[in-house]
């Protein structure tokens, strides 16, 4: 059983692709309860009773074990930032484009400790290089998260790079979307998987890929190809003409463009 606080799981990923594994999860007998906020867990002998609120109603769920997977918060509460005049939000220190505190110019923050940018592990490595450069040489370098890839290591994996359709529309971009359920494709069936799909967003004016969203075997590796294409501005037509080793899952990329 999965108890999820939001209206749908994995809110930051493409909803059409998220719907596929959620549907499959329910088909194999796993309950997915959304809009459900856990209020407490009570031990009843060898079992657990989970108390929750769902759409204004009190709910109780019996379980043998409970796993907390709500993510992480920055470990900065003990730094006494207020004493140093460092403004912060729930997500972390409020910084400018140079990762410098907006309220104390002697303080820099990056990775999980900064309130801006994607909450992903590679961001930390990237931010360190940026803020150290600015500390030593003066503010002139800014972080660039274009095309940064993220993945959910589920079975099968779900991965994303670039913009979602919602973000692309909000940015006023003109683009077309290639979207398909590929559960019947050879590379999905040959490894015994039942669920896969993709959605790729391509700018109508430049032919550049602005977003890629993958679900299926090795999606967590394939997304890195799209991350490179997005960051370097490789046209979709050029990537489509690239011949990948067959029958790797990467050989399906040209059919997504």
Role assignments for model-derived ranges:
Residues 31-33, 61, 108, 176-178:
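General small-molecule cofactor/ligand-binding pocket signal
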Residues 55, 96-97, 203-204:
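Short, acidic, Ser/Thr-enriched surface-loop or helix-capping motifs
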Residues 87-89, 138-147, 173-178:
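A short alpha-helix-loop-beta-strand transition element characteristic
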Residues 60-137:
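FAD-site-proximal beta/loop scaffold in flavoenzymes
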Residues 10, 75-78, 90, 117, ...:
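Glycine/Thr-rich phosphate-binding loops of Rossmann-like dinucleotide-binding domains
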Residues 136, 153-257:
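Flexible, glycine-rich terminal cap/loop adjacent to redox cofactors
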Residues 1-45, 51-57, 117-125, 132-133, ...:
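Rossmann-like dinucleotide-binding cores of NAD(P)H-dependent redox enzymes
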Residues 45, 89, 204-206:
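Short acidic-glycine loop/turn motifs at beta-strand connectors
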